[in-house]
Amino acid sequence: EISEGLVGSEMCIRDSVNSIKKIIKLKDPTNIVLEKWKRPNGLNISKVSIPIGVIGIIYESRPNVTSDVASLCFKSGNPVILKGGSEAFYSNLILSKLFRKSLKKNKVDENFIQFIDIKKRTVVDFLLTKMSRFIDVIIPRGGKGLVKKVQDLSTVPTIGHLEGICHSYVDKDANPKIAQNVVYNAKLRNTAICGATETILLHKQIIKKIGNSILKSLEE
């Protein structure tokens, strides 16, 4: 249900805070030497991780996306422009203001994180077709319709998926009890999220052993 993702309950806020704290603890992903080699002429070449640049995020509903994306982009050194759905407009606006306030307090340019505080859908079209000089990549986060629109119209490079890609695979050596619990959790813990399992793949040698029990648990 879309309403589930919009509820700003104490638990949801606590989960968002915990998510931010986990991101803070992650190692800096930039300026890491991923690979290096020496050419026959003596030239040393290094492959180093760097920020992508300005990232545009177009997403629907969930306010937690605002906090997660803002945190991840700041952690990775990528300025971000956020365009959230109208369903959670005011929650997103408040969250973005809190992030900007925190940046300013810590003497960081608050414009590192920007939120488009306009509800009109034409803003999305403008981002996709008129901002190629200012945005390096656009990432859509939402339903199939949104992702397809972004991929069809964008003059900016995009990172996204069109069809569902969430699979759960059970190998032939898997513990049946654990496998059943994992598949059940992946599919039914929260069916509203885009990360819920859509396809279950079973190794042919384990189908007879666990197939029916998995299906039965999902049906119940």
Model-derived segments and spans:
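Short, small-residue-biased leader/transition segments that mark boundaries at the very start
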Residues: 1-13
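Membrane-anchoring hydrophobic helices of lipid-metabolizing enzymes
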Residues: 17-36
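A structured beta-alpha segment of the ubiquitous adenosine-cofactor-binding alpha/beta core
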Residues: 22, 40-47, 114-132
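Conserved small-residue-rich beta-alpha loop and adjacent elements
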Residues: 30-102, 106, 154-160
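ALDH superfamily catalytic-core signature
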Residues: 61-64, 68-79, 98, 105, ...
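General beta-strand structural signal in soluble alpha/beta enzymes
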Residues: 82, 114-117, 139-142, 158-161
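A glycine-rich helix N-cap at a beta->alpha junction
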Residues: 100-116, 136
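Active-site/ligand-binding-proximal alpha/beta "capping" segment
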Residues: 125-137, 149-152
